[in-house]
């Protein structure tokens, strides 16, 4: 089974360049603006989109993404409405891979089986669930794969060669390498350390390796894209989004253009990396 993720990475490989992966929280700052933002991402140069599922206790998220989740929850965003957002996006874009990222609890409450049916029908391509280790694969990972979704696993600087095979066993789509330890948005990614880590992971898997956490500038994105199959940017986009809001935390006329402009400049960094590496 070839998924949208498989097709996108295959196309990018032919072009000799890395994927630019963007993250935004569903429903931030409201559902209408969230849809406009998602629609603007591919036009600005995003190859793959990660959509955050808002949750009340996001333990791996830094202040920017926590605040985004709170804004989304305040705007009434639920998992059901997140899937409706995906469905609305898919009306005009059937090619861009969409990956839902977040925590297991909202899916557990929704019900694993109905969630997987609804997610697949809406046009979701993959899941990144940060608080489900491989030991819990029977909970969601294996049913997700059976439903035709990619299950993307996180690897970190502390995931050693002994642990990696377990982490990678049921992973598909791509491997998400968290380049810095700690919460999102906290530190900058180091290109030489990333290069060594990507090489090490690739000894264990043929899957593409995307690198996230700590990428904030076009130069940083370019440096990572030289060594990885994809560069993921989230906190930097959420920061720009939050700075564009009014005093009440509502969207302004500047919100979508501000995010799209940053995406375009980061995309130029990622997409220019192939030429730098050749």
Curated annotation (Swiss-Prot):
It catalyses: (1S,2R)-1-C-(indol-3-yl)glycerol 3-phosphate + L-serine = D-glyceraldehyde 3-phosphate + L-tryptophan + H2O. Gene3D superfamilies: Aldolase class I. The active site is at residues 50, 61. CDD domains: Tryptophan_synthase_alpha. PROSITE patterns: TRP_SYNTHASE_ALPHA (PS00167). Pfam families: Trp_syntA. GO terms for cellular component: cytosol. Coiled coil: none annotated. Pathway: Amino-acid biosynthesis; L-tryptophan biosynthesis; L-tryptophan from chorismate: step 5/5. NCBIfam families: trpA (TIGR00262). Tetramer of two alpha and two beta chains. Belongs to the TrpA family. The alpha subunit is responsible for the aldol cleavage of indoleglycerol phosphate to indole and glyceraldehyde 3-phosphate. PANTHER family: TRYPTOPHAN SYNTHASE ALPHA CHAIN, CHLOROPLASTIC, TRYPTOPHAN SYNTHASE, ALPHA CHAIN. This is Tryptophan synthase alpha chain. It comes from Rhodopseudomonas palustris (strain BisA53). The gene is trpA.
